[in-house]
Amino acid sequence: MEMRGKITKINENGLGVLGNILVPFAYPGDEVEVTETRERFGKIIARDFKLMTPSPLRIPGKCSHFGKCGGCLWQGLRYREQLKLKEEIFKRITGIEAEIKGSPRIWYFRNISNFIITVNGIGFKEFGMPKTVVNIRECPIFSERTPKYLKALKDFLRESNLKPWNWREGDVHYLQVREGKFTGEVMVNIIAHVPLNYREALMEAFNFADSIYWSLKADKKDDPRGFPTLVLGNEVIREKVEGITYLIHPSVFFQTNSYALPLLLKSVEKFCEGSKVLDLYSGIGTLSLYLAKRGFEVTGVEVNGTSVEMAKRSAEINSINATFIQGKAEDAELEGYETLIVDPPRKGLKEFSRRIVKKGPNTLIYVSCNPLRFILDYRNYLSEAYKVDDALLIDMFPHTPHIEAVIKLVRR
């Protein structure tokens, strides 16, 4: 299918809209000529297009891989326009007007990156093409040291003669790198399908890292997950945000933008009522530790045992008094608190919302990177007992359409 015209708007997934065609890397005001399309999930997506007349909102991309790599749909859009679009998209999805706070840094802000290692290249997947890899040289949203990390990986692969992933089999699958943006510490984690037999080569290639892990992957799923074993260095790396040192292990989640994290922490604190706070899906205690340091009496509940261990150890080294319990958030005792914080996985709360409706406190703070899931939880369950009192958006993900929302709900 071919079509020429002007992009009229951006859809909820960050794609330009041209009639019934969705155009990646295109922005309102762009005049484009779509020359090739494909169908995916019932949608017609532009596979190739020519930019005939650029929108005044457009700027040159900083990255040489922009336009192919699927990581940064909006890198060619002025940052203030990105923020405006995120407010508009959030309102379109939820019906809620909310102010957005921009990230203090919009380049080299990510503290984690997962480089897929394949026979076709090492890097990130092409937009909409899950088996096509962009062989990258740089990544301006992750780290200025990306070329150094990739060179070390290639040196190791050459010395070890290990085979890259070919979508069915292979020895090594991912290189995961984490950086402490405020500590300078680096963790390297190789996700592989074979045990480590080239320890010396690995240590030599990544001799700059503070922590080196080898994670054995038991399945063939295309994700950067395995069972980590420490090869050399420290068990954890540290990140320091708002005066709190957080301990980070390869098996845990940490917010990906260390520079914007203070905005998220302060937004949650602003919405808290009373002194007794229950933090569900608390992870390594990112919110709990900050709130406890600010004087709240906080209990965090998290199912991941390693995350709970990191939270407890972080509390100890920071001399912070907070309680952390390992268990399912859905089984937590909800009574006796004045504020409940939920930061669920992307699938949302679903049926657990019914218990919150019955037994939750007067104030509920819903932290979400998935506005659609939030509004489904709200309309289907939470609205029975709660109403939206306030909301703030934090741009944790510049150059992408992703939105982090903090929504305050109060009992009707």
Swiss-Prot record:
Keywords: 4Fe-4S, Iron, Iron-sulfur, Metal-binding, Methyltransferase, rRNA processing, S-adenosyl-L-methionine, Transferase. It is an enzyme of class 2 (transferase). Its EC number is 2.1.1.189. It catalyses: uridine(747) in 23S rRNA + S-adenosyl-L-methionine = 5-methyluridine(747) in 23S rRNA + S-adenosyl-L-homocysteine + H(+). Coiled coil: none annotated. The active site is at residue 369. GO terms for molecular function: 4 iron, 4 sulfur cluster binding; metal ion binding; rRNA (uridine-C5-)-methyltransferase activity. [4Fe-4S] cluster binds at residues 63, 69, 72, 139. Disulfide bonds: none annotated. S-adenosyl-L-methionine binds at residues 255, 281, 302, 343. GO terms for biological process: rRNA methylation. Pfam families: PabTrmU54_TRAM_dom, tRNA_U5-meth_tr. CDD domains: AdoMet_MTases (cd02440). Belongs to the class I-like SAM-binding methyltransferase superfamily. RNA M5U methyltransferase family. NCBIfam families: rumA (TIGR00479). Catalyzes the formation of 5-methyl-uridine at position equivalent to 747 (m5U747) in 23S rRNA. This is 23S rRNA (uracil(747)-C(5))-methyltransferase. It comes from Pyrococcus horikoshii (strain ATCC 700860 / DSM 12428 / JCM 9974 / NBRC 100139 / OT-3). The lineage of its organism: Archaea, Methanobacteriati, Methanobacteriota, Thermococci, Thermococcales.
